[in-house]
């Protein structure tokens, strides 16, 4: 009987009330979608938005990306005021564009401009998947083509960070046309001996992966990035085969010779610096007048 008096009580975890949960401001904590670890957002930002537990690369917005690779204060933006219209009068498209402008503080899904990496001048374009899933419409294509032409004029390398769901369906054939336009601009840059570095981040799919994203002299990618044209389910239904678990990942593409390297975000700036150093003088072997 005495033994019954000293039975250990079961331990219960205290579940915070809804009011306590509400007292935690939004954005203070971030949950990793891969390992489910919850961490302070400010610590995640200090680590370039890479999970300290599992190494998952969280998406970066355009400005975070530029800050991580360019010399401080060196960036000068191109074509900032360029915005998309609704040439096909697609229902609801203008409202969606306006909502994304307010949400992201961007006018379109790509930011272009020039800056330096270890004092070496480059022209850079960074796609931002928060704006229409980084889809490529007429303005995205035009901004990228103009940036490539600027690199050609300045005789400096062109670097792009891609993150896109592909061509923008609301612009129909006008969006598909950007695949050819950007590719032609890059061909001109290449013919003159210009250096082009493409860095594919998660996700790079559809018409973007099938055009300028895959045309680099160096094709790099971040770990775990989804890279491909059609979706996994569509391919499986077409070929009637089960695809490997790592199909369309950066690591799978590297193993099959479609990438030059998979580069951790911590090492990205230094990797770019080394490539640029090898191609000093802008990588321009022979310039055509």
From Swiss-Prot:
Residues that coordinate or bind Zn(2+): 32, 35, 51, 54
Catalytic activity: N(6)-carboxybiotinyl-L-lysyl-[protein] + acetyl-CoA = N(6)-biotinyl-L-lysyl-[protein] + malonyl-CoA
Xref: Pfam families: Carboxyl_trans, Zn_ribbon_ACC
Keywords assigned: ATP-binding, Cytoplasm, Fatty acid biosynthesis, Fatty acid metabolism, Lipid biosynthesis, Lipid metabolism, Metal-binding, Nucleotide-binding, Transferase, Zinc, Zinc-finger
Needed cofactors: Zn(2+)
Function: Component of the acetyl coenzyme A carboxylase (ACC) complex. Biotin carboxylase (BC) catalyzes the carboxylation of biotin on its carrier protein (BCCP) and then the CO(2) group is transferred by the transcarboxylase to acetyl-CoA to form malonyl-CoA.
Protein name in UniProt: Acetyl-coenzyme A carboxylase carboxyl transferase subunit beta
Source organism (scientific name): Bacillus mycoides (strain KBAB4)
């Amino acid at each position: 009987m005495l033994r019954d008096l000293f039975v250990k009580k079961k331990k219960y975890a205290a579940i915070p009330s809804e009011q306590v949960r509400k007292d935690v401001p939004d954005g203070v904590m971030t949950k990793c979608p891969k390992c489910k670890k919850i961490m302070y957002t400010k610590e995640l930002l200090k680590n370039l938005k890479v999970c300290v537990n599992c190494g998952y690369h969280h998406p970066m917005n355009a400005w975070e990306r530029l800050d991580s690779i360019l010399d401080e204060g060196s960036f000068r933006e191109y074509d900032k005021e360029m915005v998309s219209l609704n040439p096909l009068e697609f229902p609801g498209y203008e409202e969606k564009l306006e909502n994304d402008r307010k949400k992201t503080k961007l006018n379109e899904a790509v930011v272009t401009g020039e800056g330096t990496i270890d004092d070496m001048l480059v022209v850079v374009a960074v796609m931002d998947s928060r704006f229409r899933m980084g889809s490529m419409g007429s303005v995205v294509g035009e901004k990228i083509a103009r940036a490539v032409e600027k690199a050609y004029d300045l005789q400096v390398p062109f670097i792009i960070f891609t993150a896109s769901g592909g061509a923008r369906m609301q612009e129909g054939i006008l969006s598909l046309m950007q695949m050819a336009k950007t590719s032609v601009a890059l061909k001109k840059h290449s013919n003159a001996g210009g250096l082009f570095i493409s860095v594919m981040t998660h996700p790079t799919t559809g018409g973007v992966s099938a055009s300028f994203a895959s045309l680099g002299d160096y094709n790099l990618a971040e770990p775990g990035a989804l890279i491909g044209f059609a979706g996994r389910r569509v391919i499986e239904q077409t070929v009637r085969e089960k695809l490997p678990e790592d199909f369309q990942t950066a690591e799978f593409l590297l193993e099959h010779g479609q990438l030059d390297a998979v580069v951790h975000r911590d090492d990205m700036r230094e990797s770019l610096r080394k490539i640029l150093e090898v191609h000093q003088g802008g990588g321009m072997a022979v310039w055509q007048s």
